[in-house]
Curated annotation (Swiss-Prot):
This is Probable transcriptional regulatory protein NMB1648. GO terms for biological process: regulation of DNA-templated transcription. Its main location: cytoplasm. GO terms for molecular function: DNA binding. GO terms for cellular component: cytosol. PANTHER family: TRANSCRIPTIONAL REGULATORY PROTEIN YEBC-RELATED (PTHR12532:SF6), TRANSLATIONAL ACTIVATOR OF CYTOCHROME C OXIDASE 1 (PTHR12532). Belongs to the TACO1 family. It comes from the Bacteria. It is found in: Cytoplasm. The keyword Protein biosynthesis does not apply. It comes from Neisseria meningitidis serogroup B (strain ATCC BAA-335 / MC58).
Length: 242
């Protein structure tokens, strides 16, 4: 199965994530706390917590911070009660946006999200206005040059749903959300190290943006990601920023 080129987008995303690394710990602590509250403190039986712990390890979060977040979630330590919220809307060129938040103040969060949309050329929509265009799935990206047949065999044996070869030669392994961490671990054990991966909401129909429109859309995404209550921003936009 073939896919479009996304190598440049991956590199661009990584550069932006590195620039925002100061906020990553705060978001991870929130996610670990909520995951532990919803499904318990054992990552073996809690896929959401396992994913959050994978991300914490990738970002070198101190183990004490991780354990405190788990303890707050399970009630062993007193902590803030976060509410999960999802907002949907439209960006430049009608590109779809989904914004996931964890907050202790819904009124503040919706005001901040609406302001970010309005100030940057977008529109906050109603519940369900773009959700139909997204599917919840995990993905792992491998550099061009990896033996496609061998990787496909290992991935499918590990429980992956699909393997996609992109136009630029990179290979993408698609998983069910709860299987992502297990597939990643199995492939690493087989000698396949991914260069990018996550559990995401992926747009089924994408919106290509270039020039000023791409720059404006990036500004809107950045404004949303910079909000303290925002955990993740998903979009149908494919940005050609070169």
């Amino acid at each position: 199965m073939a896919g479009h080129s996304k190598w440049a987008n991956i590199q661009h995303k990584k550069a932006r994530q590195d620039a925002k690394r100061g906020k990553i710990f705060t978001r991870l602590i929130k996610e670990i706390t909520v995951a532990a509250r919803m499904g318990g403190g054992d990552p073996g039986s809690n896929p959401r917590l396992r994913l959050a712990l994978e991300k914490a390890a990738e970002n070198n979060m101190p183990k004490d911070n991780v354990q405190r977040a788990i303890d707050k979630g399970t009630g062993n330590l007193e902590g803030v009660e976060y509410i999960e919220l999802r907002y949907e809307g439209y960006g430049i060129g009608g590109a779809a946006l989904m914004v996931d938040c964890l907050t202790d103040n819904k009124t503040r969060t919706v005001a901040d999200v609406r302001h970010a949309f309005t100030k940057n050329g977008g529109n906050l929509g109603t519940d369900g206005c773009v959700a139909f265009n997204f599917v919840h799935q995990g993905y792992l990206v491998f550099e061009p040059g990896v033996d496609e047949d061998a990787l496909m065999e290992a991935a499918l044996e590990a429980g992956a749903e699909d393997v996609v070869t992109n136009d630029d030669g990179s290979i993408e392994v698609i998983t069910a959300p709860n299987d992502w961490a297990g597939v990643k671990s199995a492939l690493e054990a087989a000698g396949y190290k991914s260069v990018d991966g996550d559990v995401t909401m992926r747009a089924q129909n994408e919106t290509e943006l270039s020039g000023d429109d791409a720059v404006k859309m990036q500004k809107l995404i950045d404004a949303l990601e910079d909000l303290d209550d925002v955990q993740d921003v998903y979009t149908s936009a494919v940005l050609n920023l070169d």
